[in-house]
Amino acid sequence: MKIVEVKHPLVKHKLGLMRAADINTKDFRALATEVGSLLTYEATTDLETEAIEIDGWCGKVEVERIKGKKVTVVPILRAGLGMMDGVLEHIPSARISVVGIYRNEETLEPVPYFTKLANDVEERLAIIVDPMLATGGSMIATIDLLKKAGCKQIKVLVLVAAPEGIKALEAAHPDVELYTASIDSHLNEHGYIVPGLGDAGDKIFGTK
């Protein structure tokens, strides 16, 4: 599995701000979008382009455009919504596919409750966004759903990832690509990433 830890200074700086215990909802939400945007830039460097001719200000000019059906953004509800706009800043015409999965806090197992995928999801690059890759259960379940729908190319964008989650994801889906702002130390006994960001969903939605 391709694993990319994006070490750009802007990513490090913004993620460092997000780790503060006293960060407010407004700032956390804005930074989640910004880091999501920077991760998107890294994850789309291999998009295929094609040359086309258009009318420029001084006549015909050859330019490059993204080729064919492009992207569907797949936020995992609810926290993934906090990163979605960062992707759409670069790919505003992307289709949105929504997957609702929550983690049972006792068993730590994923529980799916909602799925609405783009009609042509099998023809698109799926970019899954979720702030945390902890145990990997929710991400694996989401990829299972996408592959069952015929999706062949999948990339995962997360703010922070635990080694345990990376290992589980690689074992289940070695063909996907993972882009993260940080590979953190470990999971604690409650299944939270250390040092992590705390509960990203609560911080994005102001329910902490």
Swiss-Prot record:
Pfam families in alphabetical order: UPRTase (PF14681)
Domain of life according to the entry: Bacteria
Activity control summary: Allosterically activated by GTP.
One term of GO molecular function: magnesium ion binding
GO biological process, one term: uracil salvage
Binding site for uracil: I193, G198, D199, A200
Cofactor: Mg(2+)
Keyword Glycosyltransferase: yes
Organism this protein belongs to: Actinobacillus pleuropneumoniae serotype 5b (strain L20)
Family: Belongs to the UPRTase family.
Name used for this protein in its record: Uracil phosphoribosyltransferase
Catalytic activity reported: UMP + diphosphate = 5-phospho-alpha-D-ribose 1-diphosphate + uracil
UniProt EC number: 2.4.2.9
Gene3D superfamilies: 3.40.50.2020
Cofactor binding note: Binds 1 Mg(2+) ion per subunit. The magnesium is bound as Mg-PRPP.
Binding positions for 5-phospho-alpha-D-ribose 1-diphosphate per the UniProt entry: R78, R103, D130, P131, M132, L133, A134, T135, G136, G137, S138, D199
Function: Catalyzes the conversion of uracil and 5-phospho-alpha-D-ribose 1-diphosphate (PRPP) to UMP and diphosphate.
Database matches in InterPro entries: PRibTrfase_dom, PRTase-like, Upp_B, UPRTase/APRTase, Ura_phspho_trans
Pathway note: Pyrimidine metabolism; UMP biosynthesis via salvage pathway; UMP from uracil: step 1/1
Enzyme class label: transferase
Keywords, sorted A to Z: Allosteric enzyme, Glycosyltransferase, GTP-binding, Magnesium, Nucleotide-binding, Transferase
NCBIfam families reported for this sequence: PRK00129.1, upp
